[in-house]
Amino acid sequence: YWRGLSGWNFYFLVKFGLLWAGYLNFHPLLNLVFMAFLLMPIPKYRLHRLRHWIAIPVGFALFWHDTWLPGPQSIMSQGTQVAEFSSGYLLDLIARFINWQMIGAIFVLLVAWLFLSQWIRVTVFVVAIMVWLNVLTLTGPVFTLWPAGQPTDTVTTTGGNAAATVATAGDKPVIGDMPAQTAPPTTANLNAWLNTFYAAEEKRKTTFPAQLPPDAQPFDLLVINICSLSWSDVEAAGLMSHPLWSHFDILFKHFNSGTSYSGPAAIRLLRASCGQPSHTRLYQPADNECYLFDNLAKLGFTQHLMMDHNGEFGGFLKEVRENGGMQSELMNQSGLPTALLSFDGSPVYDDLAVLNRWLTGEEREANSRSATFFNLLPLHDGNHFPGVSKTADYKIRAQKLFDELDAFFTELEKSGRKVMVVVVPEHGGALKGDRMQISGLRDIPSPSITNVPAGVKFFGMKAPHEGAPIDINQPSSYLAISELVVRAVDGKLFTEDSVNWNKLTSNLPQTAPVSENANAVVIQYQGKPYVRLNGGDWVPYPQ
């Protein structure tokens, strides 16, 4: 009654091939149990055939579970948003899932299996490989089944401008520092480290003054929050040398957005004055001192809210108000020219027109203080030009946006207005994709998605910064932005004869790269990225 695996041999061979190539989050024990179910001897042939019918949905579910594709929870949570996508965008997404090289390789594997199975009992080899994979999980606490680097030396980086130091076994996290990474990267140790990280972050905050000094200088703060822009996207689009980057005074080269979705990213930015909370804590009330714009309002800064879209998709505007504390009325959008149509068919307005409207409005409020939050959507996946259903080329849209920002910066310089512009992208657009996610898919907040080009530029200074931007190469996040704002909040640097740029940018808060969505967490541990899906075990992120 031992009938072998028959056609299921091909099922497991495909899995082994995908595992070797690094495309699977393989679960050896579950697959071994499934294989045992298929091999278990059943005398009656009808029951044997019934088993195969039962195995089909089980095998499909297990295959899905072994991939990096979004799980049922993620699909259900995002289902209402997916339903709002235009039909053209949905077809575009489906087309991206088709990997013709992979299909060709699977076809070759099918022919090879059919040919060799005439003389070889393939089941014996398939069972042997499955047993070997399970033995591997028992013989070592951490291993990788795909070609990747080996574990690196244990290093921890402390806060401020301190250099990286080798950690000792008894290290404890110091408030303001990143927790030490000394233990082997097992699931238990990574969970413990993540809990330590969040516990330390809860105690971090930016302290704003109770009031401004009498000689404080009024200025405007403009925070530009760009959707779908990471350093990886900039490189893929060939725009690393765009003049915009040289226009900044300060550039963050390792700024972590902490998430790969718009709503959570905006909330994190609006709550920048406290340490990084977990994803769940984003949707719980925070201390009043965490809200960056509320801290500024207490010092006399008038709040403004701008968007180049309606903010309705995914309840973005609602999240910004309820969880980000931004209660200001949305700036009037009537009469703005439409530059693009969003992935849900709603208009995306011309950003230069929006910025010029802001500039005109602020000029009416001379000698006052304002803080404006501006959210931009032109780079989001699926946006297209009016009258064209196909997604507009990312490079064309990015080039246009960078040109517009550069032109706006030039106009600000000519105006002489005292303005601090802070650019913080929400997250990347996954332009290149990787082994875990196709291009445009952001369910998992990978390092290439969450490492974003944040920058700061001061306008109207008596002694402006000259030369190349000051690069901040330490791992940073929103707390560093809040710290820069509080260091400039009295506005005195706009009128100083000489600005101490080293003092302004040194000892900024550092934050370990931890990124989280509802069902996925990615951390950097001992120089390597690790991912945890749906509360399961940690595995190395495929490189």
Where would I find each of the regions flagged by the language model?
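Active-site His/acidic residue clusters
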Residues: 314, 358-403, 407, 430-441
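A structural motif corresponding to the C-terminal end of an alpha-helix
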Residues: 296-300, 408-417
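Active-site-proximal alpha/beta segments of enzymes that process anionic O-linked groups
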Residues: 143-385, 451, 478, 483-503
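Phosphate/adenylate-binding glycine loop and adjacent helical scaffold
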Residues: 489, 493-543
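Marks the mature luminal ectodomains of secretory-pathway proteins
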Residues: 399-410, 457, 483, 490
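Transmembrane and membrane-interface helices of multi-pass
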Residues: 1-161, 165
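Histidine-centered active-site microenvironments of extracellular/periplasmic hydrolases
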Residues: 418, 424-465
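A short beta-strand-to-alpha-helix junction
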Residues: 283-290, 391-401, 442-450, 462-485, ...
